[in-house]
Curated annotation (Swiss-Prot):
Stored PANTHER family: 50S RIBOSOMAL PROTEIN L32, LARGE RIBOSOMAL SUBUNIT PROTEIN BL32
Name of the protein in question: Large ribosomal subunit protein bL32
A GO term, aspect molecular function: structural constituent of ribosome
Protein family: Belongs to the bacterial ribosomal protein bL32 family.
GO cellular component: large ribosomal subunit
Lineage, uppermost ranks: Bacteria, Pseudomonadati, Pseudomonadota, Gammaproteobacteria, Alteromonadales
InterPro entries linked: Ribosomal_bL32, Ribosomal_bL32_bact, Ribosomal_zn-bd
NCBIfam families from the UniProt entry: rpmF_bact
Keyword Protein transport among record annotations: no
Stretch list, region Disordered: 1-44
Length: 56
């Protein structure tokens, strides 16, 4: 079994955890409708990069 040989310090624990923070999704504003959407995703209206790609 994996059992530590020496206790890890608070500093080492913090350094390891420094990369664990979650970040929110990056958002963009559509140039056509002004709607906020996730980057590289189609808006709810069906626009992507200012062009209608879903629906008529």
């Amino acid at each position: 079994m994996a059992v530590q040989q020496n206790r890890k310090t608070r500093s080492k624990r913090g350094m390891r955890r420094s990369h664990d923070a979650l970040t929110g999704a990056t958002l963009s504003v559509d140039s056509t409708s002004g709607e906020t959407h996730r980057r590289h995703h189609v808006t709810a209206d069906g626009y992507y990069k200012g062009k209608k790609v879903i629906g008529a």
